[in-house]
Design a protein with these regions (language model features):
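Glycan-recognition and catalytic cores of secretory/periplasmic carbohydrate-active enzymes
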Residues: 1-421
C-alpha cells in the first residue's frame, strides 16, 4: 500500500489550511542568520564580539548543548511544504541556508557540519555526561536528506554524505560493547537517516552504519516479548524504531519489521493509551494499563505524538489494519491539533482571561484543573518546537492510501484527491 500525497491531494478544510499557512508564515518569519548562527559560530564564520541582537533563545542559545537542532527541523518542514505546494519562497530560503551550510562544512575540514563541537562525541565515548549530541546532529542530517528528497537539492545530499564519513570513521574505532554504551545516550533518528542515505546513494558505508547503530539492548528484549519501555524515555526509542521501519523499506530484511511489530505490541497494544491517544508522562512511557497515577501537567509530549503517528502510518501501509488509522486520528485531533497553533473560537463573543491563541505546548496536561503552557516564537525552541513545524508543514499527508484493489480514505477532512486508477 502506498500513501497518496503531494500535489495530487489538496486540502480544503479551513482549519487545516489555517494551520498550514500559520506554519508557513512562521518558517518564513524566522531569520536565516539566526537559524544558522550556531553553525557559523562552530565553523568560525561568525566574527562578532557579542551575540547578535534578536538571536534565538531557549535551546538555541550558544550555551545550550542542543543548540542548532532546530535548523534541521526547519529544513525538513520547508522541504515538506515545498513538496506539497511548490512554494518557491520557501525553496529559495532553504537553498540559501544549504549553501551556507556547505561553506561551514568546508571551513570545518570537509566533513563536520554540526552546530556543536566534535569533542561532544568523544566525551560520550569517554563516559562524560553530555546532552544527547547524536540526537542533535541527526536533525541537520534529516533536514539535508529531506531537502534532497522533496526539493531535489543535490548539494544537500552531498553535505549529508560527507558528514556521514565522519560518523563512519568515528564509530569504527569502538568494540561492539563500547558502541552499545554510546548508543545508550539518545541518538534520535540516526538509524533512519542511514537507511535514507543507503537508498539515495546505494553506498555500502550506510549498510555498515545500519549494523553499527543496531541497538540490540532495546531491540532484543522487545523481540523476546519483554517490556523494556516502562519508565524509559519514550522519544529516545520511537525514532530508533522508525529507523527499523525505514531499514525494512530500503533493505527488505524481515528482521527490521519484526522489531517494529514487537515495539508496537509493547508500546501500544499491551500498554493502552489515554483517551487522547497519548501514552507518556514526564517524557517516559507509563506502565501498562496503569496510567491514572501518572496524570499531571507533563503528559503527552508533542514529539512522541508526532513520531508515533509516523510509526502508525508505516504499519497501516504494511498491513491495512484500520486500527492504525484510528490511532492516528486520535493523536491528530487530540495531539497535533490540540498542542500547536491554537486559536480561540468564541461562540458567545464574551471576553476571557485566558490566551486567545498559542504557538505550542510541550505537554498536554491530563489532570483536572490544569492548563496548557504556551511557548514563545523565538525564546523556547525545545524539541517539540521542531516536530511542530514538521507536523504542520503539509496537512495533505495520511489522508489517502492506495493498493492494487482500492483507495482508502483514512481521515475525514475536507480534501480533494486526483489519482489515476
Amino acid at each position: 500500500m502506498i500513501e497518496l500525497k503531494g500535489k495530487q491531494v489538496v486540502v480544503r478544510d479551513r482549519e487545516l489550511k489555517r494551520r498550514e499557512e500559520a506554519n508557513r508564515s512562521y518558517l518564513l518569519k524566522l531569520d536565516s542568520e539566526h537559524l544558522l548562527f550556531n553553525y557559523k559560530l562552530e565553523a568560525g564564520r561568525f566574527s562578532g564580539r557579542d551575540i547578535p541582537e534578536g538571536a534565538h533563545g531557549g535551546w538555541e542559545t550558544p550555551v545550550c548543548q542542543l543548540r542548532g537542532h532546530f535548523l534541521g527541523h526547519w529544513l525538513s518542514a520547508a522541504a515538506i511544504h515545498y513538496g506539497e505546494t511548490g512554494d518557491s519562497e520557501l525553496k529559495v530560503k532553504a537553498e540559501a541556508i544549504i549553501n551556507e551550510l556547505a561553506e561551514c562544512q568546508k571551513d570545518n575540514g570537509g566533513q563536520w557540519i554540526g552546530p556543536i563541537p566534535e569533542k561532544y562525541l568523544h566525551w560520550i565515548a569517554n563516559g562524560k555526561e553530555i546532552w544527547a549530541p547524536q540526537y542533535n546532529l541527526h536533525k541537520i542530517l534529516m533536514g539535508l536528506v529531506d531537502s534532497y528528497r522533496y526539493i531535489g537539492n543535490k548539494k544537500a545530499l552531498t553535505v549529508a554524505d560527507q558528514f556521514a564519513d565522519w560518523f563512519l570513521e568515528w564509530s569504527g574505532q569502538f568494540t561492539r560493547e563500547k558502541f552499545d554504551d554510546i548508543l545508550d545516550v539518545e541518538t534520535g533518528g540516526m538509524l533512519e537517516v542511514w537507511a535514507d542515505l543507503l537508498e539515495m546513494t546505494g553506498k555500502d558505508k550506510y549498510k555498515t552504519l545500519l549494523e553499527r547503530y543496531y541497538r540490540s539492548r532495546l531491540f532484543q528484549p522487545l523481540l523476546e516479548g519483554k517490556d523494556p519501555l516502562t519508565n524509559m524515555h519514550a522519544n529516545t526509542t520511537i525514532p530508533e524504531v522508525l529507523g527499523c521501519a525505514r531499514a525494512y523499506e530500503v533493505t527488505g530484511e524481515a528482521r527490521w519489521l519484526d522489531i517494529v511489530h514487537a515495539y508496537w505490541n509493547c508500546a501500544v497494544t499491551e500498554r493502552g493509551c489515554l483517551v487522547t491517544g497519548g501514552q507518556t508522562a514526564g517524557e517516559v512511557w507509563m506502565p501498562k494499563m496503569k496510567m491514572k497515577s501518572r496524570l499531571g501537567d507533563k503528559n503527552q509530549e508533542h514529539c512522541t505524538v508526532y513520531n508515533m503517528i509516523r510509526l502508525a502510518e508505516f504499519l497501516f501501509r504494511q498491513t491495512g489494519d484500520p486500527a492504525y488509522a484510528q490511532y492516528t486520528e486520535y493523536n491528530l485531533y487530540n495531539g497535533i491539533m490540540a498542542q500547536a497553533y491554537y486559536r480561540e473560537y468564541s461562540l458567545t463573543g464574551n471576553k476571557h482571561n485566558h490566551p486567545s491563541d498559542g504557538l505550542l505546548t510541550y505537554f498536554l496536561p491530563m489532570k483536572a484543573g490544569l492548563r496548557k503552557e504556551w511557548s514563545s516564537e523565538t525564546d523556547s525552541f525545545f524539541c517539540c518546537h521542531g516536530t511542530m513545524v514538521q507536523a504542520n508543514a503539509a496537512w495533505n499527508r495520511g489522508l489517502y492510501y492506495k493498493d492494487d484493489d482500492a483507495i482508502y480514505v483514512c481521515q475525514y477532512f475536507d480534501s480533494e484527491l486526483t489519482v489515476q486508477v
